[in-house]
């Protein structure tokens, strides 16, 4: 993930929206909460991440569109919804493309 638009000269706090479709008990959501805490801590409170789980701001496709329009700063999606935006990603949806996990990570 890339964070852009973080002006160090501003005294006011900035808030970034992060939306995803996972439940709040999911480990990835827990990691996002940890990241949000660290960002707030390391930025001395000047940068905050508000997390919207469980498709509160839309499904994966809608969140990608919101990113493009600038309504969201970050999202987490699976590869499948990305195929409509980045056609080259379709290669990863081919069944049996990889022999096993080791082959996947080598590629």
Regions found by a protein language model. Give the residues of each.
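N-terminal-biased segments
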Residues: 15-22, 102-106
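Extracytoplasmic "Venus flytrap"
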Residues: 17-33, 54-58
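Alpha-to-beta junction loops
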Residues: 44-47, 63-77
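Short, polar/charged alpha-helical segment
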Residues: 25-50
């Amino acid at each position: 993930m890339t964070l852009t638009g973080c002006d160090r000269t501003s005294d006011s706090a900035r808030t970034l929206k992060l939306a995803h479709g996972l439940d709040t008990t999911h480990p990835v959501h827990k990691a996002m909460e940890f990241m949000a805490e660290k960002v707030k801590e390391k930025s001395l409170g000047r940068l905050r991440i508000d997390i919207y789980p469980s498709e509160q701001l839309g499904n994966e496709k809608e969140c990608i569109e919101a990113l493009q329009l600038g309504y969201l700063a970050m999202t987490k999606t699976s590869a499948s919804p990305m195929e409509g935006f980045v056609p080259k990603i379709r290669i990863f949806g081919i069944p049996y493309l990889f022999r096993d996990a080791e082959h996947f990570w080598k590629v």
